[in-house]
Amino acid sequence: MGQMIKVGMADLNICSCPDALTTIGLGSCIGIALYDPTTKVSGLAHIMLPDSTAIRNNTNKAKFADTGIEQLLEMMLKAGASKNRIVAKIAGGAKMFAISGNASSAINVGDQNYEASKKKLRELGIR
């Protein structure tokens, strides 16, 4: 086994086998793992928010689904991965908070993160 590389919140990284990537504490965040089985290049992003255009402080591309997934893909392609072989797995997107104890009025950042991530993967042609 190679090195275990930690990916923090609003962060992303890539590696090649035998190294591995890990993240913890997803909650409403999304963990997006990309993998090219031929070159064994992997990528992992810990996405916090769905849309970089919704807030002013958006310089950290890894924080957002719309920019983080794109940046992760670019890094993997530079490392030798092929876009047509890359497969994606998504984890996280929990509904974390309810306002005034009313579950129907929950802040739904998790669902928004999931939908934005799926949309970006479709736009990029990643399955």
Model regions and ranges:
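Ubiquitous "structural anchor" signal
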Residues: S16, Y35, D51, S100-G101
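Short loop/turn motifs enriched for small/polar and acidic residues
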Residues: A91-G93
